[in-house]
Amino acid sequence: MRRLFLSHVLGAWLLLSQLPRELSGQKPDDVIKACGRELARLRIEICGSLSWKKTVLRLEEPGLEAGQPVEIVSSSISKDAEALNTKLGLNSNLPKEQKATLSERQPSWRELLQQPALKDSNLNLEEFEETILKTQSEVEDDSLSELKNLGLDKHSRKKRMIQLSHKCCYWGCTRKELARQC
């Protein structure tokens, strides 16, 4: 009788030990302050735990269930691609190489000047080129400043890790933020 009881207790213990372990009883949004070795151990614990990764993915995408297809390409991009394919389909007598170059080609300034909006304007070539160059430089300046503000300009992964470790040490960070770096 005693052997039977011990074998049942041993069986129950083995079954319970196979269940996923709880992660320190902390929620993913609890703020943790950790520096140096503590932070490294915490990252290893979070990144090494398969159940944590599944939990984070489930928390980040609550509307998705297993088995539901996900649309990766946004609808505006797919609409543009459909329009391009339709235009290329109209020129079906062109060889494949010319179709590829036609889809990748940018219109020249002469073609742009032939459009109705620019035909009526009094822009000469120099003014037109200056306008385009000015617009391009403004866009480049804006994108570069945005990248610098985000910390993604050069060596982005290293800089983000430095910023995250600094933040975790002085102000604290969540498990979810640490899991994103895995």
Swiss-Prot record:
GO MF assignments: hormone activity
Function of the molecule: Relaxin is an ovarian hormone that acts with estrogen to produce dilatation of the birth canal in many mammals.
UniProt keyword Chloroplast present: no
Protein name, UniProt field: Prorelaxin
Cystine connections: 35-169, 47-182, 168-173
First-listed, main subcellular location of the protein, grouped into a coarse class: secreted
Assembly and binders: Heterodimer of a B chain and an A chain linked by two disulfide bonds.
Taxonomy of the source species: Eukaryota, Metazoa, Chordata, Craniata, Vertebrata
Localization per Swiss-Prot or TrEMBL: Secreted
Modified residues (Pyrrolidone carboxylic acid): 26, 163
PROSITE patterns: INSULIN
Organism: Equus caballus (Horse)
CDD domains the record matches: IlGF_like, IlGF_relaxin_like
Gene Ontology CC: one annotated term: extracellular region
PANTHER family reported in the protein's UniProt record: PRORELAXIN H2 (PTHR12004:SF13), RELAXIN (PTHR12004)
Similarity annotation: Belongs to the insulin family.
Propeptide: 54-156, 161-162
Keyword list, A-Z: Cleavage on pair of basic residues, Disulfide bond, Hormone, Pyrrolidone carboxylic acid, Secreted, Signal
Signal sequence annotation: 1-25
